[in-house]
């Protein structure tokens, strides 16, 4: 396998191929590829060797198993709901017929007792229905949390592939392959990776932002190098920010 980047994040010392296969850096030798550092953490643990796609798929499969296991906790609650619904239907069918020779006072007393009984049972059944639904909702919330974990796993995998694609893009260009010394990656406010580049020329840092629209950003940076820094000097700015569309923002 041919690596495209070396990962030197906290606890990591591994190589990655363009397809997202990770393997540990050999102790006896080093492969000369771009280096990524920073506070970013790849989707798989530092000790992992193998395909990130396989790792992500396995974690999602485990999560699906937990969701199915949690779903089984609902079964007795569903049965209790059906029983409660049947009780409510039976309650509606409860009536009293006046006996042929029954005195009116006695019949009215029985009607009153039935009304009180039905009112009491109706409250009990409604309470039972509410409690059962609350318990089901709590279980569903745990399932939703698992699905949210799956979304984060997929997003983390997609973000990692974007970083690898960025490295491949840099390596295909003779100028950028020579100019970019280090790629620093951190997590942005939304959890997505944010890139900073350490160039060989000058004393500035390039704030690149997300790996999205990488070709456009690199083209914009190259234009600024040729038309800007070449005239005013490579040591003029401390940071050059190309993360914003159609803008280059510099700080001294």
Tell where the protein language model's regions lie, with residue ranges.
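Charged, solvent-exposed interaction patches on well-folded alpha/beta domains
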Residues: 1-252
């Amino acid at each position: 396998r041919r690596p495209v980047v070396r990962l030197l994040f906290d606890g990591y010392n591994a190589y990655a191929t363009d397809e997202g296969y990770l393997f540990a850096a050999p102790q006896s030798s080093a492969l000369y590829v771009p280096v990524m550092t920073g506070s970013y953490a790849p989707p798989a643990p530092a000790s992992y060797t193998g395909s990130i796609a396989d790792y992500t798929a396995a974690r999602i499969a485990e999560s699906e198993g937990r969701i199915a296991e949690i779903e089984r906790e609902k079964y007795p609650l569903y049965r209790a709901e059906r029983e409660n619904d049947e009780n409510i239907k039976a309650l509606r069918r409860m009536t009293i017929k006046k006996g042929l020779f029954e005195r009116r006072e006695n019949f009215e007393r029985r009607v009153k007792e039935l009304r009180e009984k039905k009112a009491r049972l109706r409250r009990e059944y409604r309470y039972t229905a509410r409690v059962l639904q609350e318990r089901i909702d709590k279980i569903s919330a745990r399932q939703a949390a698992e699905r949210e974990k799956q979304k984060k796993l997929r997003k983390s995998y997609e973000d990692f592939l974007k970083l690898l694609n960025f490295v491949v893009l840099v390596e295909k260009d003779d100028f950028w392959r020579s100019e970019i010394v280090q790629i620093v990656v951190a997590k942005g406010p939304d959890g997505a990776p944010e890139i900073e580049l350490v160039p060989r020329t000058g004393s500035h840092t390039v704030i690149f932002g997300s790996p999205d629209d990488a070709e456009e950003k690199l083209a914009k940076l190259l234009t600024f190098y040729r038309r800007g820094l070449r005239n005013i000097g490579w040591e003029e700015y401390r940071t050059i920010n190309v993360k914003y569309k159609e803008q280059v923002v510099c700080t001294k």
